[in-house]
Amino acid sequence: FFGRVDFIYEGEDEPEIFYIGIGNFAEKAGHIPLVYDWRAPVSGLFYDYDKGPASYEAPMGEIHGEVASKWQYKIRNGKMIYEFESDVKIDDDILKAELGSNGEVQLKNIIRTIQKEQNAIIRNTKDRILVIQGAAGSGKTSVALHRIAYLLYHDRQNLKSSNILILSPNGVFSDYISHILPELGEENIQEMSFDLFAYRKLQDTAADCEDRCDQIEREMRDPCLLYTSPSPRD
C-alpha cells in the first residue's frame, strides 16, 4: 500500500481506516478488505480530499463523512522509505521524486501522485468523448493510461482490453508506455500508428495509399512540397 485515509462516517465518532494500494488485498478466511485498490470508490477520498468534510460514491449511493487524517507511504523491498501525514496535498519534493526526470526510459505509473484534477478525468464515466489538452510533459499520457485502467476496473462486464486501441506516433512511444497497464494489474492493449490503422482500414478500397516512407522520400526529392499544402490526389 502507499496511502491511508482515516474516515469518520456521518453520525459516527470513531474513524475507519482505509489503506490504499495498487490492488485489492483481503484476509483469506473472512475476506475482510485490508487494502483497497486505488480505483475503488473509497480510494477517491485519498486523491480528492484533505482533512475535513468529504464524500464518495458507493454502489448504495453517496457516502458522507469527514477525513480525520491522510497518510502517505513508500515501501520498497519490505522497508519503509518514507511515511508522513499529509493534511494539505502531496509534498512537492515527493512529487518530483516520484515523477522522475524527463530522461526516464519508460513512463512511470502515477498512482501515488495523482492530483485532484487528474483524478476527476481518470474517474469520469459520464462523458463518452473526452479530450485532454495540455503542454508537453503535463501528464496527458499518464492520465489517459490510468483512465484506461480505471475504466477496465469499473466496467469489467462490458469492457475488455481487446476493446481498446491506442494510436501511437511510433514504436518508440509504444515501448515507452507498454508496461503501465500490466503494472496496474490489467492486460496490455493493442497499439499501432495512425498510418498503420488507416492502411488496414483502407487497404481493400480502390484508393492508392502512400505510406509514410514514400511520402518522406517524395518530399526530400522536392523540398518545396514541405512548405506547401497538400493537394488532393487522384
Where does each model-flagged region fall?
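Conserved glycine(s) of the Walker
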Residues: G139
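Alpha-helical nucleic-acid-binding subdomain
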Residues: L152-S229, R233
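The conserved Walker
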Residues: A136
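N-terminal accessory nucleic-acid engagement/regulatory domains that precede
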Residues: F1-A97
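N-terminal pre-Walker A segment at the start of P-loop NTPase domains
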Residues: N102-Q115
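Hydrophobic positions on the alpha1 helix immediately C-terminal to the Walker A/P-loop
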Residues: V143
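Pre-Walker A adenine-sensing motif
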Residues: Q115-R123
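Hydrophobic anchor at the beta1->P-loop junction of P-loop NTPases
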Residues: I132
